[in-house]
Amino acid sequence: LEAAIMDVVTSASPPVGRTRAVEILRGGRSKVVAQYAYDALAGYGAFAHLRSADVLGRVDEMLAAGRLRSTGGRFPKLRAA
């Protein structure tokens, strides 16, 4: 899961925040996912079997451990640390 999170964070363009990364990993079908072709990313839908809260929890663990960082601001984006 951590490798997939890191892959989404580093390959998504434009960059994504916590909840969008979770949406991509769980295979969400929002307009934004289609608009920016996030559904073409390797990790798209790979963790559809997990609850959103579980995937988000892992993202938060990676932030706390310093493996990811947040840009901050009103719409924070994730970056590899």
PLM regions: where:
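Accessory DNA-binding and partner-docking regions appended to nucleic-acid-acting proteins
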Residues: 1-81
